[in-house]
């Protein structure tokens, strides 16, 4: 998508490493959910070059909760790029940490919730 407005709302590691594919809104009786679809950019993993790897498409989508926008629940729908090492046939991925370990939250959203959980108690 050519419009760059989304860069004001998404975590920096998402902007740096993923391309925006589309945005959908899903509505039910209780809430509106915004799904932001992102595909990992075509960037080789560290230590590899063009001739050593072959792109093998994307992983299945992962759903990550992020900060709400204008009372809408935000879900980042992320597809990671898979690479095959030509010499060995092994599949590898870039080393990206886009969600908080042990959660389905973006790192920033998890830090916000953790910081503010003591305020709410």
What are these regions (language model features)?
Residues 18, 22-23, 51-53, 81, ...:
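General N-terminal targeting signals
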Residues 5, 59-62, 93:
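Residue-level signal for pocket-adjacent positions within structured domains
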Residues 64-121:
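Short, positively charged, Gly/Tyr-enriched micro-motifs
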């Amino acid at each position: 998508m050519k419009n760059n407005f989304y860069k004001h709302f998404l975590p920096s590691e998402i902007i740096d490493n993923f391309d925006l594919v589309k945005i959908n809104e899903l509505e039910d009786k209780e809430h509106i959910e915004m799904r932001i679809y992102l595909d990992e950019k075509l960037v080789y993993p560290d230590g590899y070059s063009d001739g050593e790897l072959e792109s093998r498409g994307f992983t299945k989508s992962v759903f990550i909760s992020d900060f709400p926008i204008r009372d809408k629940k935000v879900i980042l729908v992320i597809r990671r790029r898979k690479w095959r090492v030509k010499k060995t046939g092994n599949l590898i991925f870039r080393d990206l940490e886009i969600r908080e370990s042990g959660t389905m939250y973006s790192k920033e959203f998890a830090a916000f919730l953790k910081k503010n959980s003591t305020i709410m108690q």
